[in-house]
């Protein structure tokens, strides 16, 4: 009996320590912790902010296009995308004709934003003209530009 009393007392003591040690502290000081990037105030005058905005616009365009499968090249077209500092597009991108109106608006917005970025930060480029594709072919359900 004395032995079981010691076992139960030890078990109760260990349980109490476990419960109190795992409890979260509500009064923790979070001022020294790093701020999540989404919670940080946007510094709209910084180059990094503008680069991130360009990347976001480009990824929106690419993800919208990636939703569509290429089964017939006649259902696809291509457009110039981006703006080199000394003129001309950065690249060409294939897009499905069925979303032509919305995607061309996004591509034009991206190109205009890149042109403004180039002027704002005095960006220089290689000034090489990018060859315009001669067509599109479907490969693995993805549109591939033909040069």
Please tell me what each predicted stretch does.
Residues 2-9:
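Bacterial N-terminal signal peptides that target proteins for export
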Residues 19-21:
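C-terminal motif of bacterial Sec signal peptides marking the signal peptidase cleavage site
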Residues 23-31:
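Bacterial lipoprotein signal-peptidase II cleavage site
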Residues 31-51:
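Post-signal peptide N-terminal segment of mature Sec-exported envelope proteins
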Residues 48-87:
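Extracytoplasmic/periplasm-facing segments of secreted or lipoprotein envelope proteins
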Residues 82-103:
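Iron-sulfur (Fe-S) cluster-binding segments and ferredoxin-like electron-carrier domains
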Residues 102-135:
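Functional cores of ribonucleases/endoribonucleases
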Residues 135-146:
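Short, low-complexity, Pro/Ser/Thr/Gly-rich segments in the mature regions of secreted, periplasmic
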């Amino acid at each position: 009996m004395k032995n079981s009393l010691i076992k139960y007392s030890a078990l109760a003591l260990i349980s109490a320590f476990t419960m109190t040690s795992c409890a979260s502290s509500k009064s923790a000081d979070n001022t020294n912790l790093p701020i999540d990037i989404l919670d940080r105030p946007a510094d709209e005058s910084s180059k990094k902010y503008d680069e991130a905005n360009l990347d976001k616009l480009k990824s929106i365009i690419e993800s919208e296009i990636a939703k569509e499968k290429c089964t017939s090249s006649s259902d696809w077209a291509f457009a110039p995308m981006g703006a080199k500092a000394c003129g001309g597009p950065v690249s060409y991108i294939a897009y499905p004709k069925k979303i032509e109106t919305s995607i061309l608006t996004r591509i034009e917005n991206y190109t205009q934003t890149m042109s403004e970025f180039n002027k704002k930060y005095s960006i220089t480029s290689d000034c090489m003209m990018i060859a315009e594709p001669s067509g599109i072919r479907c490969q693995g359900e993805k549109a591939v530009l033909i040069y």
